């Protein structure tokens, strides 16, 4: 069995399992965004703090704040319509020059999914938010 240091995902596997991820560089710019998140986010500024506010915990929406919060739960909200709440965790990359935010929409009602134009195929297979679609 491989050691934990050898576990990894291909780019395609990562994109499929985390379609709402964000990569934020040390300059605060959003470098990459998962396909599902990119589809529901309107065009806008490249800066993380310009596009999102951090709801929980109370912190500045910048790289330093994200790096200090590594591995812990956070909740974000987009600053533009449609307003999207996302929850997930921050993973500081080994080189320290970027952080991955592994996110999923914070869905509390099926209407939230419908309002964003999302479907089952927009979520990672492991994402429990999809269960709401089946509960209604």
Q: Model-predicted segments: where are they?
A:
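Sensory/regulatory domains in signal-transduction proteins
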Residues: 20, 27-121
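PAS-family sensory modules
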Residues: 1-24, 98-136
């Amino acid at each position: 069995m491989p050691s934990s240091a050898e576990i990894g995902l291909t780019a395609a596997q990562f994109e499929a399992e985390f379609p709402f991820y964000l990569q934020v560089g040390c300059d605060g710019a959003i470098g990459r965004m998962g396909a599902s998140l990119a589809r529901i986010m309107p065009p806008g500024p490249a800066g993380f703090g310009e596009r999102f506010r951090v709801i929980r915990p109370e912190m500045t929406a910048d790289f330093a704040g994200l790096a200090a919060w590594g591995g812990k739960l956070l909740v974000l909200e987009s600053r533009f319509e449609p307003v999207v709440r996302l929850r997930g965790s921050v993973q500081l990359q080994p080189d320290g020059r970027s952080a991955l935010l592994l996110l999923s929409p914070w869905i509390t009602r099926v209407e939230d999914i419908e309002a964003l134009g999302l479907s089952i195929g927009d979520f990672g297979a492991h994402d429990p938010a999809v269960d709401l679609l089946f509960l209604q």
